[in-house]
């Protein structure tokens, strides 16, 4: 048995409800046609091969001998129905895949898109497209019928998810007999749960708590693809409408120091995108560099000058901006 601490549960376990499906893949209950490896490569899951036949046609060969958690065989027709159900229930998902039609051809699924969509495979790895038995939706909000190595046996919103090994899993016998997943959203409480051995593993070790786990623990660092960014309000009412102000801000930020403080050494000081996960980062020219003198020069040329309060001002109005961040994550 293993106890796991996650930093977030969805409101439900319905794969089509908002972003709730992410919990299903994290706990080993749900699977998609393909998935992504830690080094960002596509690998087969419920489809064992695929082909982009032409700009608007994709062919997926559906893995044989797969069963849903209720014992029903997973057929290409079942996969078709699952994808179509997801598109019907989730406008966000339908918009991402741009699917015009899905047809069954033997063990293959033929997907036609409304336009060339090179990112279709990537979109189908999104947890919203976990394959489920849509003929068995009576408990979809708490016990969706999926295909993963672990079967959901109970769900208590905001508390726990209980799972049991699925004996008929296509990938062989799961490594654990059972798993308890706990919803521990507070970073400090999650860290304390691991320290006290209330859980065996936690997701998302807050940077401020990394030092607690130097001895006797194994922290795995992986290059992420999530980008936390500040978006500028370009409307005329905002001082950021002025390109000079935006440029000055880009030059005044000390990226390395900010990364060291916020990421506690685990986050690279880079902008505008993380170098570890974005193709083409190294080719970006004129990356913003910390240069306070340059920022001062830019603002001066734009008509700003320091007033008696030491604040930059223009036409008698001090330069001031308001920053709003997502307040749920205290690590930010």
Feature names for model-found ranges:
Residues 5-53, 84, 145:
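N-terminal lobe/hinge region of extracytoplasmic solute-binding protein
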Residues 41, 124-174, 178, 188, ...:
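Gly/Pro-rich hinge or "lid" segments in bacterial periplasmic/extracellular proteins
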Residues 48-90, 110, 239:
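Aromatic- and charge-enriched surface segment that lines or borders ligand/interaction sites
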Residues 51, 93-134, 154-156:
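Surface-exposed binding/hinge segments that line
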Residues 164-169, 224-248, 252, 261, ...:
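A bilobed periplasmic-binding-protein/Venus flytrap-type ligand-binding module shared by bacterial periplasmic
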Residues 166-212:
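Ligand-site clamp/hinge motif
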Residues 213, 240-278, 289-298:
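Periplasmic-binding protein-like
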Residues 236, 269-308, 326-332:
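Structural transition elements
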């Amino acid at each position: 048995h293993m106890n796991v601490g996650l930093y977030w549960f969805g409101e439900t376990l319905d794969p089509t409800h908002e972003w709730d499906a992410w919990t299903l893949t994290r706990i080993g209950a749900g699977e998609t046609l393909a998935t992504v490896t830690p080094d960002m490569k596509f690998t087969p899951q419920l489809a064992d091969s695929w082909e982009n036949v032409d700009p608007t046609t994709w062919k997926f060969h559906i893995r044989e001998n797969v069963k849903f958690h209720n014992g029903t065989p997973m057929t290409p027709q079942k996969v078709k129905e699952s994808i179509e159900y997801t598109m019907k229930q989730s406008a966000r998902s339908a918009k991402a895949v741009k699917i015009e039609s899905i047809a069954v051809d033997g063990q293959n699924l033929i997907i036609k898109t409304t336009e060339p969509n090179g990112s279709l495979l990537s979109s189908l790895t999104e947890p919203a497209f976990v394959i489920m038995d849509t003929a068995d939706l009576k408990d979809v909000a708490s016990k969706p019928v999926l295909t993963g190595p672990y079967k959901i046996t109970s769900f208590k919103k905001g508390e726990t998810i209980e799972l049991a090994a699925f004996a008929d899993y296509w990938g062989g016998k799961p490594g654990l007999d059972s798993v308890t997943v706990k919803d521990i959203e507070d970073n400090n409480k999650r860290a304390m749960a691991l320290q006290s051995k209330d859980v065996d593993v936690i997701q998302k070790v807050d940077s401020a708590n990394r030092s607690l786990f130097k001895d006797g623990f194994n922290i795995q660092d992986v290059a992420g693809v999530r980008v936390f960014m500040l978006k500028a309000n370009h409307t005329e009412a905002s001082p950021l409408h002025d390109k000079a102000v935006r440029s000055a801000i880009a030059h005044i930020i000390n990226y390395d120091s900010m990364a060291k403080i916020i990421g506690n050494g685990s986050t690279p000081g880079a902008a505008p995108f993380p170098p570890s996960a974005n193709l083409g980062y190294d080719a970006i020219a004129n990356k913003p560099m910390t240069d306070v003198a340059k920022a001062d020069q830019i603002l001066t040329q734009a008509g700003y000058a320091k007033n008696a309060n030491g604040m930059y001002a223009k036409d008698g109005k001090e330069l001031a901006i308001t920053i709003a961040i997502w307040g749920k994550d205290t690590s930010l």
